[in-house]
Amino acid sequence: GVKPPPARITSYYLALAAGGALGGVLSAVAAPLALGDNYELHLSIAAAWILVLAVMITDPHSRLYDGRNMPRLAAYLGLLFAMGVSMGVYVYHTRSEALVIDRNFYGTLKVREIDAAQPQLHHRMLVSGRVIHGAQFQSPSLRRIASQYYSPASGVGLILTSQAAAGPRRVGVVGLGTATLAAYAERGDVYRLYEINPAVVRLADRYFTFLADARQRGASIECFLGDARLVLERQTPQQFDVLTIDAFTGDAVPAHLLTVEAFALYLNHLAAPDGVIAVHVSNIHLDLTRVVQAVAQQHDLDAVSVESSPDGSPVGSLAVWVLLARRGSAVLAIPTAKRLADSVPGDGVLWTDDVHSLVDVLR
């Protein structure tokens, strides 16, 4: 078997641990520095094939040793060549469709240019793998349109639109993306945006105009780099009319932003009596509505859910938002909203800093 004799068991497990640690360092630190995209899996497979061939060619007990079976060796070499060609095609395809690729510790971000030859459809998208973090039309007459999960029919769009007539607003945004929500900013509004990934801030400012356009309209826009919860803990109460929590569309969900303690912090930064917390819960793997519903019950908040559809837009997307407000507030009286019941089905959906499990909310 693979397990070594007892005399060598310590060194065996030490080697396993060292290999795991080295792999983690290479994946999290070295690969982002050396590779512009997620190529390490493909390179690892190719390297494994080359290693296997090298061992088989040099092992006297192998059928490929010293050219004993040339047809089989040719087949292996052909397979390796085909793998190299497919890798080359993949690299070319991913790079040709991307305006820019930015990779760091947090992952790989790409800005894609789409339908550039059609002015009315021409738009840019910020993507990470299959997750879209926002889009913007490039035509000057269309670029203020809020699309994707943030359309006027979405939960957050309805809240921001309904409050526009009340005068200048204070809006907090956790999770920047392309800064699409800045499309709703008007003169006198104060928008404070929180983002942990410096690459997101850089790309949103350089390749999308939502932030610059909002400033030009007279809104005050300020970005804070770092973990949103830690930054908010250091700040004095912000008196937000709307605080959006939008960091859950990807595969890695920051659970510490959905705990009872986190929402206590959000409430401390919310304006009374009609401040709204808008939580974006669209996720193909997790039913996060149950988590937010349980937290709302714990803090004695009203909660409604708003679902919006793409409506045929080339940059549209299905979106689910849960809106929370203090009991008795009329701010959640939205015709398309579905009131969430006070009772929460199932167990284990109330997350705290000490106890939270993604398994309980898997779809």
Which role does the model predict for each range below?
Residues 1-342, 346, 353, 357-363:
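Alpha-helical transmembrane segments of multi-pass membrane proteins
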